[in-house]
A protein has these predicted regions:
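Soluble catalytic domains of enzymes that build or remodel membrane lipids, polysaccharides, and related
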Residues: 92-105, 115-283
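N-terminal, active-site-proximal structural segment of metallo-dependent hydrolase catalytic domains
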Residues: 1-124
């Protein structure tokens, strides 16, 4: 146990370094927090009170770093949302028919299809009845909405990636929904892509709601600067996020202060490599 605590302390401290090694360790802080929690309870159970106290210090250190950018235990939002709104996020699908049927079956208000592999298939001919293809089908990211879109389009993110956005009227006012997938991009390209997203958000008059895979943890420096520059918040807590708890969390819902995150769950992947995620909000 002593060796484990020494390693945890070293990794937790080294994660503050600005070099590549420090940034690599920094993305694992949530796992350091979980491991410190387990060590603390194990030490308490075996009456190793000094080790338990040291584990508590490491737990608090990593907790405060993580919670500075993302809710850890409870989702964000002030509980003022009145309209329930369901979204499905599907990165890089190869079977549009499966994801369209899933959206229809789940009665999703919005479907984000990010960087699809179309193989010559046109989305416009597969859109379920009662849904609207928010933009043309050029083989890039797009949105499908149950509400008539006010406007829609894409943002080039570099590296062949694109973000899809759509403006919808909900409860008498406009909201802009933006979705993308930055996973697998280099750190430099991720930061460039966030710069493009930042410029888009800054130019919008209506509240912007962002959901997808940022390819980095919310407490990373680049993500922190992005949130601060737009006064946005991460809304989903880490225990309800739609990814593996044993891996660094990179999938988030980001929005304005009053936006309420109601929950999320992973859905069956069916004919696609990546499983879609169902996200529920109150707007």
């Amino acid at each position: 146990m002593k060796s484990l605590l020494v390693l945890l302390a070293f990794f937790s401290a080294a994660a503050f370094a600005g070099n590549a090694f420090g940034q690599f360790l920094n993305q694992w802080r949530f796992q350091f927090y979980l491991l410190s929690l387990l060590v603390m309870f194990y030490a308490l159970f075996n009456r190793f009170f000094l080790y338990s106290f040291l584990a508590l210090l490491l737990l608090l250190l990593n907790f405060f770093v993580v919670s500075s950018s993302v809710p850890v235990l409870f989702s964000g939002g002030e509980g003022k949302g009145k309209t329930a709104f369901g979204m499905i996020y599907q990165p890089r699908p190869s079977s549009l028919l499966d994801i369209f049927e899933t959206a229809d079956r789940r009665r999703a208000d919005l479907l984000a299809v990010i960087d699809p592999v179309l193989n010559g298939v046109s989305p416009s001919g597969l859109v379920p009845a009662g849904y609207h293809l928010a933009d043309n089908d050029e083989g890039k990211s797009f949105m499908v909405s149950s509400r008539p879109p006010r406007s829609a389009g894409r943002i080039g993110l570099g590296g062949g990636r694109s973000a899809a956005f759509v403006s919808l009227e909900i409860g008498g006012r406009g909201y802009v929904f933006l979705s993308f997938d930055l996973s697998g991009m280099s750190r430099r390209n991720k930061e460039k892509a966030l710069g493009y997203v930042n410029a888009f958000v800054a130019a919008e008059d209506d509240p912007v709601i962002i959901f997808g895979d940022f390819g980095m943890t919310a407490w990373s420096p680049a993500f922190g600067r992005f949130l601060a520059s737009n006064r946005l918040e991460v809304k989903n807590d880490l225990f309800s996020r739609f990814a593996n708890l044993l891996m660094p969390p990179t999938q988030y819902v980001v929005g304005y202060r009053n936006l309420e995150f109601a929950g999320s769950r992973r859905l069956p992947s069916l004919g696609n490599r990546s499983a879609p995620s169902l996200i529920r909000l109150k707007i």
